Amino acid sequence: KARIDAVATMLQFGKPTIDDLANAEIAYAPPFASAMDAVNAVANVADNILSGQLKPISSKEFGELWKDRANNNVFFADARPAVAGNATAAKYPGEWHAIALEDIEAKFDSIPKDRPVALVCNTGLRSYEVMLYLHNHGVTDVVNALGGMQALIKRGDNM
């Protein structure tokens, strides 16, 4: 209810910007909610997309890239913890690459700089962090699967 009240109040004074929503102060009780409300998180994602820090693709688009992997030259990187990423990489050697967020520095040189990179993790957050690292190191032809493996599984694309 607090988030609805906060956004409704903002709407009374005009159209709130993404920045307004990202910085909205929404009441919360620490045992029951996080300090950053869903409204703030959604606005931050929108801001990252508009600024180019996040280049999202839908789970459908990711699934299509994966199905056409023999023809599209995309490098598929899995940012989940090594146990999950390695299991999928073992099923698809040479096509699926386990590059866990915590291993990105050590495995950076294994990521091609001359091919598009498609990132995935469990929900999208870890792969977003990997995307930022890659961008900061000059690798910019990178997309991130929104919703990660959870969205792919819900669609029926179980890697």
Feature roles, as predicted:
Residues 16-30, 34, 41-63, 67-74, ...:
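Rhodanese-like catalytic fold shared by cysteine-dependent sulfurtransferases
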Residues 1-21:
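C-terminal catalytic lobe of FAD-dependent flavoproteins
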